[in-house]
């Protein structure tokens, strides 16, 4: 299996620089060349806006690596964007069954995989108004969904850890 290291695509992995472009470029190259593994290397924190998953690509987060979502909602993929009603496009879930904003998004991404013993940090607390040891308050929307995959077959999630998430789901996919 051919590997694509995101550091070779310009990712910094310092936990502050937005590495979305480098990660997405590696994923797109991998998919364009028939698939393989995109590696997020151990010892780095890759801070990122939304990432689009592709067919036959394994997004592999090594043990000791962290993929951390930015707190910038404007950098998130919006599955409802083409809906003509702006209120429905923002609210999403109760009306369309789709989330309004997504961190890791797969659409017609057959054979996509997220693997490795690393961590996906959804940075959910960046989207709330107040938190304490007992509860979190704030608007339900527009908290982003961590992973949303639709119209895809043979998807795999293996050995990953997800921390500080908002909701996530798999919809209309064959297993």
Which residues make up each language-model segment?
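Extracellular/periplasmic carbohydrate-active domains that bind, remodel
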Residues: 1-175
């Amino acid at each position: 299996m051919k590997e694509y290291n995101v550091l070779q695509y310009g990712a910094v992995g310092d936990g502050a620089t937005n590495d979305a472009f480098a990660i997405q470029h590696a994923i797109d190259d991998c998919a364009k060349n028939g698939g393989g593994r995109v590696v997020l290397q151990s010892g780095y924190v890759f801070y990122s806006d939304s990432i689009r998953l592709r067919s036959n690509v394994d997004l592999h987060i090594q043990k000791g690596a962290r993929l951390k979502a930015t707190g910038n909602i404007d950098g998130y993929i919006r599955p409802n964007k083409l809906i003509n009603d702006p209120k429905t496009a923002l609210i999403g879930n109760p009306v369309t069954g789709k989330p309004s904003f997504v961190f890791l998004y797969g659409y017609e991404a057959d054979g996509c995989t997220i693997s490795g013993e690393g961590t996906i940090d959804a940075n959910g607390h960046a989207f709330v108004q107040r938190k304490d040891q007992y509860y979190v308050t704030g608007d339900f929307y527009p908290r982003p969904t961590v992973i949303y995959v639709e119209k895809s077959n043979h998807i795999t999630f293996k050995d990953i850890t997800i921390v500080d998430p908002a909701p996530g789901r798999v919809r209309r996919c064959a297993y």
